[in-house]
Amino acid sequence: MPLNLEEILALPDIGQKINYLKKGRKTELPDRCKLWDDWNPERHEIIVDKEKYPDRKVLDKESEKVFDEKTGKTYEIEAKYKTEPVNRISIPLEQDIVNIQTAFTVGTEPSMDCTPTDDDEKKLLDAVKAVFKSNKIKYQNKKIVRAWLSEQEAAEYWYVTDDDSFWAKFWKKVKTTFGGKVKPTKKLKSVLWSPFRGDKLYPFFNDEGKMIAFSREYKKKLMDDSEVTCFMTITDKMVYQWDLSKGYEERTPFAHGFPKLPVLYAYRPEPYCKKIKTFRVRLEKLLSNYADCIDYHFFPLLKLIGDVEGFMGKVKDRMVKLTGEGADAQYLTWNQANDTVKFEVETLFEKAYSMTNTPQISFEKLSGAG
C-alpha cells in the first residue's frame, strides 16, 4: 500500500493510482443533483413532484344511463373526468439570498493594499493588475463566491498559455523589470471548477492537513458527440492527465512552471441556504394553494332560489323572474379572511433572510431607510 503522493504516482496500474488519488479527499463529494434541484426553481418539488402535488381531477361529464333498444337493457356510461393543472409557484429564494451575499462580499472589487518602494516594484504591480484585468478577476470572484455558497466547493486553477499579445501593450514600460532583452511569450490564465460545471474535485491532503495535490474528474465531449471521462492531477511541479474510454490512456505529463501548487480551493460542509429550505418549500406550497383558492373563489357566483317563471328585459339587461316561497337571488362571495396567509408568508420570508443574515434590498424595504 502506497504511503505518500510520490508512491501513488509511481504505481503502474492507472486505475489503482486514480483510486488512491481520490482517497486523498477528506470530505464527502457534494451531491450535485440535490444541490441543483434546490438551486434551480424549475427543479423544485412543487414543479416536478406530481405525486406529492398532483393535478386536480375535475368532472367533465356526469354518468348517465342509456337504454339499448336492440337488447332491451339499460347500460350506465361512466362519468368522464379531465385533469386540470394546479398552480405551481416556485420561488428562487436560494438564488436571491446567495446573489445578495455575493454582492456584499465581492460586489466591490477587493483592492490591493501595496505601496511600491521603487519604480521596478511599481511596474511589477502594474503587470499583476494587468493579469487580473485580462482574466476578468472582478467577475470571476463573484462566480467563485456564488459557487462556494451554493455548490459547497469551488477551485480556481492558474495555468500558462502561449500568447505574446498580452505583453505588447506595456512591454516597453516593464521590460527593464523583467530583464529587458526577451519579451515573454506566455500569458497567465485562470479557470473555475465547480460541481455545477460538471467537475468532481479531489483535493489531496497529507497527514498535516496541507493540500499537496489536486485532482479533477470531468467529461470531455468529442466531435462525434461522444463523451470521454478525463482525470487530471496537479502537484507542486507537474500536471498528469488520463482519458478513460475503453481503458485508461495516459497523456504526456508536463511541468506547469510554478514554484507551488497553482490551485486555490474553497469548501464548506453544507450549502449556505440549507437551513432555510423548509421555509422555501412551505412558501411555495402556501402560495400555490392560495392561487388555486383565488382561481376558484374570487369571482362571485349568482345563487337563484325559487322557480324560474320567465325572463324580462333585453338580452344585455335581462332579469330572471323567480316565484315560489322564499324566492331570492344573491351572490355567493368568498368571505374567508386572508390575514393568516399574509402573516405566514411575511413571517417565512423575514425568517429566511434574517437566519442567513441577508438584508432585503427590495424597493419597499429600502424606501423607509434613512
What are these regions (language model features)?
Residues 116, 141, 153, 200, ...:
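Solvent-exposed, flexible loop/coil residues
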Residues 55, 86, 93, 111, ...:
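Generic low-complexity segments that are intrinsically disordered, proline-rich and/or Lys/Arg-biased
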Residues 1-188:
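Extended, helix-rich architectural segments
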Residues 21, 36, 49, 78, ...:
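A structural detector for beta-sheet-dominated domains
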Residues 247-370:
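Extended, charged amphipathic alpha-helical segments
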Residues 142-268:
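Extended, regular secondary-structure scaffolds
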Residues 19-43, 47-49, 137-150, 230, ...:
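Charged, low-complexity, helix-prone segments enriched in Lys/Glu/Asp/Gln
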